[in-house]
A protein has these predicted regions:
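Anionic group-binding determinants
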Residues: 1-190
Length: 190
């Protein structure tokens, strides 16, 4: 998804959304440039293969240049991963990822607008939206969360806080006088 009209913190403009086909567990990677997609995709694939001790059978994507290049094709061939492309100009064939994009984007928009946050925080809102979806959204067929299907354990959400809610950081290493504030006010981003 991208490029974003407003850059996020760190100059980020693009979003790579990766969805596991069975569990619908989702990963988002915020990118500065579209040219980073291949390296980030390869890194994520290697990480997931080590984490789950599996080989990725298939990568499905559109015909974007970032997916249809020699580096990713070579990686897929080396790993024994089949690379499949959807027909050009048919986003409905990639419905799962397209729908995730929309849902994550809408959630992020609500989070930012609810607290009147600057649009430059969209990257943090996107990450929070994805994390929240993975932890609370139920897979219809199994009645389990995406997190539970992917990780094999129940998701814990008691640590969740409202996006941009007030928080306080302790100033314990500073030389404070008797009546100085012992904390600084901030807000939670995720």
């Amino acid at each position: 998804m991208g490029p974003a009209i407003v850059q996020s913190l760190g100059g980020m403009k693009y979003i790579l959304v990766v969805v596991n086909d069975f569990t619908r567990y989702t990963w988002v990677v915020i990118l500065k440039d579209n040219s980073e997609v291949v390296d980030k995709m390869i890194h994520l694939c290697k990480k997931l293969q080590v984490e789950k001790n599996i080989l990725i059978a298939r990568i499905k994507s559109d015909h974007g240049r970032e997916f249809e290049n020699s580096k990713l094709i070579s990686f897929c061939n080396d790993q024994g991963t089949k690379q499949e492309f959807f027909a050009p100009k048919t986003p409905q064939q990639n419905g799962v990822v397209e729908r995730k994009n929309k849902v994550i984007q809408k959630m992020a928009r609500v989070m930012l607008n609810n607290k009147s946050m600057p649009k430059s925080f969209w990257g943090e809102a996107i990450n929070t939206a994805c994390h929240t979806l993975n932890k609370v959204y139920f897979h219809l067929a199994t009645k389990k969360t995406q997190y539970e299907l992917w990780r094999g354990k129940k998701s814990v959400v008691k640590y969740f806080r409202v996006f941009c809610s007030d928080c306080y950081t302790l100033r314990d290493q500073e030389n404070l006088e008797n009546f100085d504030a012992k904390s600084d006010k901030g807000f939670v981003l995720g």
